[in-house]
């Protein structure tokens, strides 16, 4: 069994335990701390990648969202800077989505 399946099984077992026996303050606090830790890690990475995006935005005089639309549509070249910029932009957006998911906003 792979790690993700094992983790999902543990989460389901925990859900069943809480439904049957009620809330456990220790479990609730542990889960909150794990989520807070992961959210903080994502925030740090988002900030770091955001700084990298700003370097490209200043160098090429356009916002990353505008660049990515043009790049995806093939309207600008595919030099190494653009490939790197595109990758960083996509990583940045994926991390934002993950963070929002952990925060329960999506």
Language-model-detected regions and their locations in the chain:
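Generic serine detector
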Residues: 28-32, 64-65, 72, 86-87
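Short E/K-rich amphipathic alpha-helical oligomerization segments
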Residues: 54-76
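Small, basic N-terminal interaction modules of short regulatory proteins
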Residues: 1-58, 62, 97-106
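Short, compact, well-ordered microdomains
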Residues: 78-104
């Amino acid at each position: 069994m792979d790690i993700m399946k094992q983790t999902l099984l543990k989460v389901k077992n925990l859900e069943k335990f809480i439904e049957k026996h009620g809330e456990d303050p220790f479990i609730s606090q542990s889960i909150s701390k794990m989520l807070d830790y992961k959210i903080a890690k994502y925030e740090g990475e988002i900030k770091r990648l955001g700084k990298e995006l700003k370097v490209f935005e200043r160098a090429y005089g356009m916002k990353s969202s505008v660049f990515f639309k043009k790049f995806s549509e093939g309207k600008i070249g595919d030099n190494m800077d653009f490939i790197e910029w595109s990758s960083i932009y996509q990583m940045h957006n994926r991390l934002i989505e993950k963070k929002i998911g952990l925060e329960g906003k999506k």
